[in-house]
């Protein structure tokens, strides 16, 4: 089983997460940030991941700490669930539309952390989520999963753009974690 159970408790947040890479897309997510919950639910569904997240935090301040720490824990869970990465495809990509929005995501689970993100948002918020935190979410996730991630999105509706990004990320990850045989896909012999 390729799964992980991670807990992170700080003075700012308390997060419990369970992740199953070879799941069915079921999820139970409660961060207290409705739009963020919607994005994570969509991520689980389209990534065919089973994902449980119970997260609380200092939302009275703002949503920054909770979104950042959720991304940290998700990155750690991905890394733990992948183990030594034996047999995984390693690379994944997806191009996903949502109405006028079009998201492109390409990733490499080879252990080199890097994020390139080309996305502009017009509105300061979508629901209860600050749009600046979309980039911060993916930065924190890549740092903690040791993933190289390239993201680009076009469109004019920020909800559609963000949702297309999360769906494209889910499909790209789904392809990258797929078992394609045996062995490590690296000339170094390790990922």
UniProtKB/Swiss-Prot annotation:
Keywords, sorted A to Z: Amino-acid biosynthesis, Cytoplasm, Histidine biosynthesis, Lyase
Compartment(s) where it occurs, according to its Swiss-Prot or TrEMBL record: Cytoplasm
Pfam families in the cross-refs: IGPD
Primary location: cytoplasm
Keyword set includes Amino-acid biosynthesis: yes
Associated pathway: Amino-acid biosynthesis; L-histidine biosynthesis; L-histidine from 5-phospho-alpha-D-ribose 1-diphosphate: step 6/9
The EC number(s) this enzyme carries: 4.2.1.19
Protein name from the UniProt record: Imidazoleglycerol-phosphate dehydratase
